[in-house]
Amino acid sequence: MTTIVSVRRNNQVVIAGDGQVSLGNTVMKGNAKKVRRLYHNKVLAGFAGSTADAFTLFERFEAKLEMHQGHLMRAAVEMAKDWRSDKVLRKLEALLAVADAESSLIITGNGDVVQPENDLIAIGSGGAFAQSAATALLENTDLSALEIAEKSLTIAGNICVFTNQFKTIEELKY
């Protein structure tokens, strides 16, 4: 699978992801970019799960952002409604982590939209490791959101066999 982590601190939000694509127990690619900018570079998004499914979701989510003039929460809720009602979308196996200057959200394969506590998101196979590391760093250091995301992703990559050390990191300052 993968690991995606999003951290918000001091007028900065970051989404970071590793680059491993696995098929069963085989690493197929080590430098995949699972994090990108959407809607005029104002929204960050990362995915965990099936790569093909995630690209479908990125396209649909970006269309929802355009339709709702970049309003993240509204686009996420509309995307979730579609996900629940569309037979094709319901079969997609992916999670999206999305963030803008105001909100951080998880959009699940069940069509749920979750705004996590402390604006900390960690999804994918290494998500629990990254979340633990990021929580400890948020509570006990003055590191920036970028530094916390990078360090927590490194820790997850050291523990989770489906997460590697190649990182794609996107940041918004506001």
Swiss-Prot record:
Molecular functions per Gene Ontology: metal ion binding; threonine-type endopeptidase activity
Chief place where the protein resides: cytoplasm
Residues that bind Na(+): 157, 160, 163
UniProt xrefs under PROSITE patterns: PROTEASOME_BETA_2
Compartment(s) of residence: Cytoplasm
Biological process according to GO: proteolysis involved in protein catabolic process
Disulfide links within the chain: none
Active site: residue positions: 2
Record field: transmembrane: none
Activity control mechanisms: Allosterically activated by HslU binding.
CC per GO annotation: HslUV protease complex; proteasome core complex
Keyword set includes Phosphoprotein: no
UniProt keyword list: Allosteric enzyme, Cytoplasm, Hydrolase, Metal-binding, Protease, Sodium, Threonine protease
Record keyword Metal-binding present: yes
Enzyme class: hydrolase
CDD domains: protease_HslV
Catalytic activity annotation: ATP-dependent cleavage of peptide bonds with broad specificity
Domain of life assignment: Bacteria
EC number: 3.4.25.2
Assembly behavior: A double ring-shaped homohexamer of HslV is capped on each side by a ring-shaped HslU homohexamer. The assembly of the HslU/HslV complex is dependent on binding of ATP.
Main function: Protease subunit of a proteasome-like degradation complex believed to be a general protein degrading machinery.
PANTHER family per record: ATP-DEPENDENT PROTEASE SUBUNIT HSLV, METALLOPROTEASE TLDD
Family membership noted in the UniProt record: Belongs to the peptidase T1B family. HslV subfamily.
The protein's name in its UniProt record: ATP-dependent protease subunit HslV
Native species: Shewanella pealeana (strain ATCC 700345 / ANG-SQ1)
